[in-house]
C-alpha cells in the first residue's frame, strides 16, 4: 500500500541499503523530511475568503428596511446617523432602557442610509413601481426571507473549532509547530525557520530525546555532517557543513532547507501529509541494517549525535510512547492539522451552499418586493414564509382548538381540553401561542401580521420589540 503512494525513483532511494558510504547517502532520508516540510510549509491554509457582505444579502436587508414602518426607519435618522450604538443608547437611555442592539446597529444604520433617499443609487436601481403592493402587504414575506438569509449568512463567517478558536489559524499553528523547535525559531511571516544561533554542539542538540521535535530540527541534525560522503544532496549543504569539531554552523538551516526539491503545487494538505508519512514509515530503519533502533538515515558510529553521522534516532519516541510514528512530535502535529482540515472542508462546502441559497432568496425577495397590488403572493415567497413559520413555531396547527370542536370527541386531546360545563374546546395551559422574542413574530386573531411599531404585540411583551423587524 505504501509503495503505491510513492514515486518509483523516491522509493528506490528510500529502500537502497548497503554498508558502504557513498555520496548522497543521506538523500533518501532527506527526501522524507523535505516531503514533510513541503506539507507543513506550502500547504498552509489561506485566509477565509467567503464574504459575508454579499450584494444579494445587502439587497435583501435593504428591501426589508425600505418597506419597514416609518416609525422604525426614523430611529436611524438625525443624530443616530452618525452615532455608535453606545452613543445612541446613552442619548436615549430612558426610551430604550434594557435594549442591546450592538450586534446589528451598524448594519441597520447602513441600510437606512442606503434606502432613505428615493433618488439614491440603491433606490434608483431597485425602484418599486407605483402598481406594486403596499409595504404592509409584502412585509411578512420579505421579513421571513431576511430572517432566513441572516441564518444562512452565519455560515459565511470564518469557521471555528469546537472550543471556539479560529479554525484556519489553528491548522496553520499546528503546521508551524511541526516546522520549527529547539535551536530553530519561526522566520518572519511564519513561513520557515531560522537558526541555529551561535554554534551549538551537535552532541547536545541532536539527542534521541530531542529527535522528532520538529521537521526543521531533524533536517538540521541529519544534514549537519562533516564527512564528505554523507551528504543530503549531490552538491552538499554548503555553509551548513560543521567546520569546528562537533559544532553546528550558525544559521546553517537555511542552507540545508534550500536543497529540498520543490514539491508539487497541486494537491491538498491531507494528500501532502499522507505522502510524507508514507515515505517516513517506509524509510525508517532501512539504511541501518542490523539495528533495532528506528533510525532515519545512516549512523556512522552507532549514534546520531556526531558530525560523522547523517541520521535521526527515533528509538526513544517508539519505545516510550508505544504509538508508532505518531509518537514523533512533528508527525502528531501534522496528523492533528489533517484532522482539522476535514472540518475546514465541511465549512467551505457549507459556505458555498449558503451563498447559493442567499442568491435564490434575493430573487424571491425581489419578486415579492415588486409584486402587483391585489395579486396572489409569489408562490416561492409563500413557500419561504411557510417554511420559516414551521421552523419558528413547529409544524403544529395553532388553531386546533376552535368552536368547530363542538363535542368532547371532536376536541383534540394532544393540545386541547374540553370544558363540559361551557361546552368549549380550548388550548391546554402552556400551549397557547405567545410572542417568543426578538426576531420572532405572532399573528393576531384578525390574521393580519404585526408590521408597525404601534400594533406589535412584542412591544408589550419584550424590551427588544423592535429587533424583530430587521435581521
UniProtKB/Swiss-Prot annotation:
Residue ranges of the propeptide: 455-471
Lipid attachment residues per UniProt (GPI-anchor amidated serine): 454
Major localization listed first in the record, in broad terms: membrane
Disulfide bonds: none
GO cellular component annotations of the record: plasma membrane; side of membrane
Domain of life, per lineage: Eukaryota
Classification via InterPro entries: Trypano_VSG_B_N_dom
Record's subcellular location: Cell membrane
Region (Disordered): 406-449
Pfam family, one: VSG_B
Signal peptide limits: 1-21
Keyword DNA-binding: no
Glycan-modified residues: 64, 405, 450
Membrane topology per record: Lipid-anchor; GPI-anchor
Basic and acidic residues bias (residue ranges): 412-431
Keyword terms of this UniProt record: Cell membrane, Glycoprotein, GPI-anchor, Lipoprotein, Membrane, Signal, Trypanosomiasis
Function field: VSG forms a coat on the surface of the parasite. The trypanosome evades the immune response of the host by expressing a series of antigenically distinct VSGs from an estimated 1000 VSG genes.
Name this polypeptide is given: Variant surface glycoprotein ILTAT 1.21
Amino acid at each position: 500500500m505504501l509503495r503505491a503512494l510513492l514515486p518509483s525513483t523516491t522509493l528506490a532511494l528510500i529502500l537502497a541499503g548497503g554498508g558502504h558510504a557513498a555520496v548522497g547517502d543521506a538523500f533518501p532520508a532527506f527526501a522524507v523530511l523535505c516531503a514533510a516540510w513541503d506539507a507543513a510549509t506550502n500547504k498552509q491554509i489561506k485566509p477565509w475568503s467567503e464574504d459575508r457582505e454579499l450584494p444579494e444579502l445587502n439587497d435583501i436587508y435593504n428591501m426589508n428596511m425600505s418597506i419597514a414602518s416609518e416609525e422604525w426607519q426614523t430611529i436611524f435618522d438625525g443624530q443616530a446617523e452618525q452615532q455608535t450604538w453606545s452613543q445612541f443608547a446613552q442619548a436615549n437611555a430612558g426610551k430604550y432602557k434594557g435594549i442591546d442592539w450592538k450586534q446589528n446597529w451598524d448594519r441597520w444604520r447602513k441600510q437606512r442610509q442606503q434606502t432613505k433617499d428615493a433618488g439614491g443609487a440603491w433606490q434608483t436601481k431597485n425602484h418599486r413601481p407605483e402598481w406594486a403592493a403596499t409595504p404592509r402587504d409584502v412585509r411578512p414575506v420579505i421579513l421571513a426571507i431576511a430572517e432566513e438569509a441572516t441564518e444562512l449568512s452565519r455560515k459565511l463567517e470564518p469557521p471555528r473549532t469546537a472550543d471556539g478558536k479560529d479554525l484556519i489559524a489553528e491548522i496553520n499553528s499546528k503546521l508551524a509547530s511541526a516546522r520549527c523547535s529547539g535551536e530553530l525559531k519561526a522566520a518572519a511571516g511564519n513561513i520557515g525557520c531560522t537558526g541555529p544561533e551561535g554554534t551549538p554542539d551537535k552532541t547536545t542538540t541532536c539527542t534521541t530525546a530531542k529527535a522528532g521535535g520538529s521537521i526543521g530540527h531533524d533536517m538540521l541534525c541529519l544534514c549537519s555532517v562533516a564527512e564528505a560522503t554523507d551528504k543530503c544532496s549531490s552538491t552538499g549543504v554548503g555553509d551548513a557543513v560543521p567546520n569546528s569539531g562537533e559544532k553546528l554552523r550558525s544559521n546553517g538551516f537555511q542552507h540545508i532547507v534550500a536543497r529540498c526539491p520543490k514539491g508539487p503545487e497541486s494537491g491538498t494538505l491531507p494528500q501532502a501529509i499522507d505522502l510524507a508519512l508514507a515515505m517516513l514509515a517506509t524509510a525508517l530503519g532501512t539504511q541501518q541494517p542490523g539495528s533495532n533502533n528506528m533510525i532515519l538515515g545512516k549512523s556512522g558510529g552507532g549514534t546520531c549525535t556526531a558530525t560523522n553521522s547523517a541520521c535521526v534516532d527515533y528509538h526513544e519516541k517508539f519505545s516510550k510512547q508505544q504509538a508508532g510514528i505518531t509518537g514523533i512530535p512533528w508527525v502528531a502535529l501534522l496528523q492533528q492539522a489533517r484532522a482539522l482540515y476535514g472540518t475546514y472542508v465541511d465549512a467551505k462546502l457549507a459556505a458555498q451552499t449558503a451563498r447559493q441559497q442567499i442568491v435564490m432568496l434575493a430573487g424571491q425577495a425581489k419578486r415579492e418586493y415588486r409584486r402587483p397590488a391585489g395579486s396572489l403572493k409569489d408562490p416561492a415567497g409563500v413557500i419561504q414564509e411557510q417554511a420559516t413559520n414551521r421552523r419558528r413555531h413547529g409544524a403544529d396547527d395553532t388553531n386546533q382548538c376552535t368552536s368547530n370542536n363542538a363535542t368532547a370527541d371532536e376536541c383534540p386531546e394532544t393540545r386541547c381540553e374540553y370544558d363540559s360545563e361551557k361546552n368549549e374546546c380550548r388550548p391546554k395551559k402552556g400551549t397557547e401561542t405567545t410572542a417568543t422574542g426578538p426576531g420572532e413574530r405572532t399573528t393576531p386573531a384578525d390574521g393580519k401580521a404585526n408590521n408597525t411599531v404601534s400594533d406589535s404585540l412584542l412591544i408589550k411583551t419584550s424590551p427588544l420589540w423592535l429587533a424583530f423587524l430587521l435581521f
